[in-house]
Amino acid sequence: MGQYEIIKKLEKVGTEILETSRSELYMYMKFLALAFGGFKYALSDETGGVGTDGFYIYYSPMFLIERYRTDMKWVNRAYLHMIFHCMFRHPSSREGRQKELWDLSCDIAAEHLIDSFRYGGIRRDMTAEKRRVYTIVDENIKTVSAQAVYRLLSSMGLADDEIEKMSDEFRVDDHIFWSVYDNETQNIQMPDNMPPE
C-alpha cells in the first residue's frame, strides 16, 4: 500500500470515528442538532491532537484512533468541547486579550458546561484540580462565560506556573486553528491549507 492509500485509509477511519461520536452525542442532545451538522473533517499535520477553526475539525489520525480505542468518552467530550467553542464564538472573540489566558478561559467555560450535563457518554470523574477551579468560578461568576472567566482569572494575578497547571487540566483541543481570526479587522480569513470540499 502506497503513502496515498495509507493517508486515504487514515482519513476514512478518522472521519468514521468523528461521525460515530457525532451520532452518539446527537442521540442524547437533539437540541444541538444544527451544531452537530456544522463541521467537516480533515487530517492535519499541524496538530498532535484535534482542533477546529469553526469550519473543520482537524485531527491527527494516530492520536484520534488511539483516543477512540482507549477512551470513547474523551472523543465525545472533545467533539462537544469544540462545538461549544464555536457556538460561543470563542475562536473569534479574543479581541486583544492575552492569548494563553483567553485560551484557558474558553476551555474552562466549555468544560464547565460539559460537566453540567448528566449524559453518561460524556461523564467523567473530576480531578481535585478541576473541582477546585470550578469552586472558584462558581463562587465568583453568576453566569459562566469565557469572558467572565477571563475577567476573573485576570483579576487573580496568577503566576505563569498556575496558568500552565490550569491549562494542562482543561486543555482538550488545539487552538492553533483559531489563528484564522487573528487580524486587525476580525474578518474571517480562510486558511491557505483549507481542504477541498
Feature locations, PLM:
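Short, functionally important secondary-structure microenvironments
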Residues: M1-N76, I83-E197
